[in-house]
Design a protein with these regions (language model features):
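RNase H-like, Mg2+-dependent phosphodiesterase core
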Residues: 1-246
Length: 246
């Protein structure tokens, strides 16, 4: 007699923590970046502020962008965030800027721009000119350069409180949401470059590795040199020949 097959029950992924604090008066500006370690192209930085009402943002499919196995589900999550977050914002720095300033400086500047834009957008959405004490930056990682914002209520610059959370994209919903927006924006940028310049896929496999130092990418650099969009200050790009693509 044939043994009946067991039906697999898919385990529901537990929701990430919605907020870092329990302060309902505080707007948490959560941030993450994508492409920090890439050898090609831009680094993207994103911020997300969630609505206080959980019914407006369930967070059911929100997780660390690296945990998605389906590109379709990743993009669906990104669209959900854009439609349902209180506010969101994306910034980037290109390869030349990264080489001139260094990657850490570019990420910090991008995060500062995200905070500035997020405060402006929250004020617009709520139709209230909040003072800086109503905002806090929640940053993925272990380092953040403090940011000061002009407060019209005090007529001077006030430092925005912040915390850093290592592996925060696996702990907090809004940081995970920011990681999703940053990753999808960067992936789209690389794929658009590959469509415009097919040689990027042919020589470096960028349509697959999106700029990370995979075997195919490294082999392409060793054989063909680097393009004007590679980061000249990263790894083997420092000594590689530059070949301009037109």
């Amino acid at each position: 007699m044939e043994t009946p097959r067991k039906t697999r029950v898919k385990k529901e992924t537990p929701l990430l923590e919605r907020f870092y604090t329990n302060n309902d008066e505080l707007y948490e500006i959560s941030m993450d970046e994508a492409g920090r370690g890439c050898m090609f192209g831009r680094v993207y930085i994103a911020s997300v502020v969630l609505p206080k009402n959980p019914e407006l943002f369930s967070g059911v499919n929100i997780k660390d962008s690296k945990k998605f196995s389906s590109k379709t589900k990743l993009r669906e999550a990104a669209e959900y965030i854009k439609q349902n977050a209180l506010v969101w914002h994306i910034e980037y720095a290109d390869a030349n800027e990264i080489d001139d300033k260094n990657i850490l400086m570019c990420v910090m500047e991008g995060m500062h721009k995200c905070i500035r834009s997020s405060i402006t957008k929250v004020n617009e959405v709520t139709n209230i000119q909040h003072n800086t004490s109503r905002f806090m930056a929640i940053v993925d990682g272990n380092y953040f350069k403090p940011y000061c914002h002009f407060d019209s209520s005090t007529n001077d610059y006030q430092q925005i409180p912040h915390v850093t959370v290592e592996k925060g994209d696996g702990k907090y919903m809004a940081i995970a949401a920011a990681s999703i927006l940053a990753k999808t924006a960067r992936d789209d940028y690389v794929l658009e470059m590959c469509e415009k310049y097919p040689i990027l896929s042919e020589k470096y496999g960028l349509d697959k590795n999106v700029g990370y130092g995979t075997k195919a990418h490294m082999s392409g650099i060793n054989e063909h040199g680097i393009t004007q969009w590679h980061r000249r200050s990263f790894g083997c790009c420092k000594t590689a020949m530059v070949t301009e693509i037109e």
